[in-house]
UniProtKB/Swiss-Prot annotation:
The gene is cnsF. One of its GO terms (biological process) is alkaloid metabolic process. This is Tryptophan dimethylallyltransferase cnsF. PANTHER family: INDOLE PRENYLTRANSFERASE TDIB-RELATED (PTHR40627), PRENYLTRANSFERASE ASQH2-RELATED (PTHR40627:SF3). Disruption phenotype: Abolishes the biosynthesis of communesins A and B. L-tryptophan binds at I84, L85, E93, Y194, R248. Tryptophan dimethylallyltransferase; part of the gene cluster that mediates the biosynthesis of communesins, a prominent class of indole alkaloids with great potential as pharmaceuticals. Communesins are biosynthesized by the coupling of tryptamine and aurantioclavine, two building blocks derived from L-tryptophan.
Length: 453
């Protein structure tokens, strides 16, 4: 076996190859989605220690219930729905919970009506997608989903109003997406809502829409959420009308509403350690020993990742596939409102998209070692090479989208959110990517030429 065959490569995953031999796809779009993403997905499951039965089950469910809702395979010269999920507008993303070695994925459900006159703002596809997931997991509860869906996304009349009045413009058109946490032989579903279009259609602010919908949730199902919600509202109001932080989206667990967590996400344009400290402490409101201990860890992560300080704005457009990013995105935070906690619990996001991936990898590896996550520290860099064996590992700056951190009961939680498209041997096996190759493409042309020789 040659040295090329011995190098890390997700396309060599045994489970991916077995399933590729036996699975059938109704069309070429779904087949391409499978071969583009499944190598990385299968390898990530293996690396995280999922047993072989779980790996087959997870990939089988993804093929059956998720791939059909990813829409046409993305190219630069074909029409497609652009999702806010990634800067390239692609509707699927894998992430890794580093502390628990758990895999999760997020996707924006898309169907044939998405973006057409029947559903110009992709309001409807998520219903069909959720129905599929509920058939596979009867524990999925949609009561809270129905509540936020009605309050934060446009209905048919509002959709028509947006079209007729041309109010959508360049605003975010993604309204909802789903995420699956893969654990205990099954999955837990979360839903995310972006109220930007609802705000445009109703004239109400995003902040008002989100907070009022949570107040209704408190009154109907979760009175114990009133206290953490009050603290968060006070913080947002205290930041003032000129604040660089603003509410962006909301998420909830699709479980019994009385036990479900709700998360409110803020975008922070000021990229600095001081801004992140303010987000973490809620402007000094979180003063517990645990919160302050975590603050030291956040400073440590900041010193390792070294995001360049700036005042950043989230771009209104999307990057063409294959573009090398040259941008710094804003920071982000979510505040979890729990029925058993009077204080909102923050999870901060280091926006690493556009930063050198080798530098980020080395920073994460150092942090893993300090946390005692030895196995992950030893394997993380090789795993990334396996996911993208034909990328220039020295110069790539598009693989790590976010690194998130939270801290609960003395335990650090970190997740990484990774670019998930055209993994493994895709660049040398399937032609759609080749037509976009240029000297600036993240795939190293010398390696590509060598592989194709």
């Amino acid at each position: 076996m040659g040295t090329h065959d011995m190098s890390p490569n997700a396309s060599h995953s045994y489970i991916y190859r077995v399933l590729s031999d036996i699975l059938e796809f109704p069309d070429n779009e779904q087949r391409m989605w499978w071969h583009s993403v499944a190598p990385m997905f299968a390898e990530m499951l293996r690396a995280c220690g999922y047993d072989i039965h779980e790996q087959y089950k997870i990939l089988g469910i993804w093929k059956k219930a998720v791939i059909p809702f990813l829409g046409c395979y993305p190219t630069n010269d074909g029409p497609r729905w652009l999702s806010i999920l990634t800067r390239y507008g692609t509707p699927f993303e894998l992430s890794l919970n580093c502390s628990h070695r758990l895999v999760r994925y997020t996707f924006e459900p898309i169907n044939a009506a998405t973006g057409t006159d029947k559903d110009p703002f992709n309001t409807q596809a998520i219903w069909e997608s959720l129905s599929q997931l509920r058939r596979l997991n009867g524990d999925v509860d949609t009561e809270l989903f129905n509540h936020f869906k009605a309050n934060l996304t446009v209905d048919n009349a509002e959709s028509a109003h947006l079209v007729e009045s041309n109010l959508a413009g360049s605003k975010i058109r993604t309204q909802n997406k789903l995420a699956l946490d893969l654990q205990n032989g099954s999955f837990v579903v979360k839903a995310y809502f972006y109220p930007t279009l609802k705000s445009a259609a109703t004239g109400r602010s995003i902040t008002d829409l989100m907070l009022s919908s949570v107040r209704q949730q408190v009154q109907k199902w979760s009175p114990t959420l009133a206290q953490p919600l009050s603290v968060l509202e006070e913080y947002i109001e205290a930041r003032g009308p000129d604040s660089t932080a603003s509410p962006r989206l909301l998420s909830c667990d699709l479980i019994n509403p009385e036990r479900a967590r709700t998360k409110i996400y803020l975008l922070e344009r000021q990229v600095s350690i001081e801004a992140m400290e303010d987000l973490w402490t809620l402007g000094g409101r979180r003063k517990s020993d645990s919160a302050l201990a975590a603050l030291d860890i956040i400073r440590e992560i900041w010193s390792l990742i070294q995001l360049p300080p700036c005042l950043a704005s989230y771009p209104s457009g999307y990057l063409p596939l294959g573009t090398v990013p040259d941008e710094q995105l804003p920071l982000m935070v979510n505040y979890t409102l729990r029925p058993d906690d009077p204080m909102p619990e923050p999870q901060v996001y280091f926006t690493t998209f556009g930063q050198n991936d080798l530098h980020v990898t080395n920073a994460l590896t150092a942090f893993f070692e300090r946390q005692g996550w030895t196995e992950l520290a030893e394997s993380y860099k090789e795993n990334l090479r396996a996911y993208y064996p034909h990328a220039d590992q020295e110069t790539a700056n598009y693989i790590h989208a976010y690194v998130s951190f939270s801290y609960r009961k003395g335990v650090s939680y970190m997740s990484v959110y990774l670019q998930t498209l055209e993994t493994g041997d895709w660049p040398i096996t399937y032609s759609p990517k080749r037509q976009y190759l240029c000297n600036e493409h993240p795939i190293h042309l010398k390696e590509l030429a060598k592989a194709c020789a």
